[in-house]
Amino acid sequence: MKVLITGTTQGIGKAIAMRFLDEGHQVIGIDRQRAGIVHEGYAHYVCDVRDKDNLPQIEDVEILINNAGTQNEDDIDINLKALIGITEKYAIQPHIRSVLNIGSASAHTGSEFPEYCASKGGVLAYTKNVAMRIAGYGATCNSLDPGGVLTPLNACVINDPELWAEIMEET
């Protein structure tokens, strides 16, 4: 299958890409950083997911995994608006089989930073919208909403023992 994943240079996105490659799928990554994966089944585009006008032309995506995300002043633009732009460009078409949006437990709990929670809550609502729209293609759209994940993005909360304990308690 042709799998498109955003945010593939590290953390969750890189792990997902490697698993699909190990299973023999064709994987295409989009990230602001250079490729962190070297594999014959992997193609990588360096671009900012927020820049809808300069997204690469990729036809017939079968699986889309929206993983690119952040926890800073760009939460709404990257976590929500860019995810919508990517999905509208690549998933709303007859070849799609599955869309997976990497959300956050914060979409359900409201904990952590206000803009981050709002962005991930928006992802949850948009996931439901897309699920209804692509069902006619026989496709599904789901959101995976993990709690605290040990990635560089979460360093600001991991390094705060009190905040990290709160997150672990809620998730």
Which stretches of residues belong to each language-model region?
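Rossmann-fold cofactor-recognition segment
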Residues: 40-51
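Conserved NAD(P)H cofactor-binding loop of Rossmann-fold oxidoreductase domains
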Residues: 67-72
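Short, flexible catalytic-loop segment of classical short-chain dehydrogenase/reductase
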Residues: 145-156, 165
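Catalytic Tyr-x(3-8)-Lys segment
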Residues: 161-171
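Catalytic loop of short-chain dehydrogenase/reductase
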Residues: 98-122, 127-136, 148-149
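Conserved glycine-rich Rossmann-like NAD(P)H-binding loop of the short-chain dehydrogenase/reductase
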Residues: 23-37
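N-terminal Rossmann NAD(P)H-binding glycine-rich loop of SDR-like oxidoreductase domains
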Residues: 9, 17
